[in-house]
Amino acid sequence: MEVKLWLQHIDKKELTRSITLPTSEINMNLFEYSNGGIQKFNVTKYESDCNLLLYEGENIKKFNKALNELNALATTDEVIALTELYPQDDIYEILEYVKEKQYEFYPNKNFNDIVEEFELDNEITIEELVNLGYSQLSTGIIKEY
């Protein structure tokens, strides 16, 4: 079983590349932490110069569970798109709404409330989501990059 990781060079804003790792490689040793959040994807034999942007694949729920167990998901500074929990069109519309509202931040509103509040009918690819330039999209936290 494998997990696909989208990566961004630590000195650049744009998406650089993706890699696929076996789930046996996904563990706390992959990451550096600061203030409880993932700061850097840090495995030299793979891509030591990159941040983890987001992940997808058959084992997304398993990987999500592992991140939660590390108390990293809610505080990470990287983009994490929960593409199996929320359809991609939902994510796109939410990001567009936040952009229109001058990147308002909703710390006290959970993701489901935001999803229900807007009509969500657009489509987006993983690459487009990353290129929108947001540094955080997880558990109801939406923030401009």
Where are these regions (language model features)?
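Mature, soluble, non-transmembrane domains
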Residues: I80-I124
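Structured domain cores in non-transmembrane regions
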Residues: I26-I91
